[in-house]
Amino acid sequence: MKNKNTGFKHLVLLFAFILCLFSCVSAKAANYYYEDGYKYTLSLGKATIISYVGSDTDLTVPSILNGKPVVKIESSAFANNKNLCSVILPDTITSMGISVFAQCENLKSIHYPEGLDRIYYRTFAGCHNLTKVNISSNIKIIEDSAFAGCTSLTYLDLPKVKEIGEYSFANCTSLSEVIFHKGFTYVGSASFKNCTNLKDVTLPLGTQTISYSAFEGCKALRHIDFPSTLVFLKSASFKDTGLVHIIVPPSVTHEEQSVFLNCKNLEEAEYHGKVIEG
């Protein structure tokens, strides 16, 4: 009899657990709201955009939904949208997920929120028609693959960016000029790999590291001035480029093998560094 009662109690507890589980799922689902093509949530008096299914081509994302400020956009919220041509994001946004606009193939221009300090992982990856994006003075970091494959992007001015991540501009085949400013320190691995039209790069005083394969395959790159603060030149960082003349400053104490491998146009190289590694 005791065993039967114990079994019955277990069944009751299991049933209660299942009911609780379904209640939690239902409660979570009930937190979604829908307005003008936006799916969003509300929490602590603030709105987060989960996704957008509208058909607008020129989109101004609202700063307020359901009377609450829009402060966040979740990962992939606009990804693979073939309709979008231009987007204005409100400056109320303080956080974004990854791949928010990835593979938006017809996106040409974007106003990026002033309140963000970075461009997140794969935010614009595969946006083949993107030609215009504002990089405000608040942006300090460009994360990995943020603009990878943006084949129509031609020019970049990065006023306060301190570092760029791996593959951040890889395969941007129309990119011809990039300007960095005071405070910049780090060029990530393969960040400009196969930017075949890149001709002009300005690396300011303060730049310390050019990482692996950073400019590999930049066939049009003929000249680059290395700042006197440069310390690390990583392997293959200028492999297969069009460099003609280089001067490596005394500040370079860590230069790895194959930095200038297959630079077939290289006519003159002056090396003043102190240590060669690898």
Name what the model sees in each region:
Residues 21-33:
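Sec-dependent signal peptide cleavage junction
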Residues 74-77, 97-100, 120-123, 143-146, ...:
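Consensus positions within tandem repeat domains that build extended binding/scaffold surfaces
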Residues 37-45, 54-71, 82-95, 104-118, ...:
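Structural signature of tandem-repeat unit edges
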Residues 1-7:
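N-terminal secretory signal peptides that target proteins for export/translocation
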Residues 52-53, 125, 148, 193, ...:
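Short, flexible turn/loop "capping" segments at secondary-structure junctions
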Residues 51-53, 168-170:
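Extracellular, surface-exposed repeat architectures
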Residues 12-23:
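Bacterial N-terminal signal peptides
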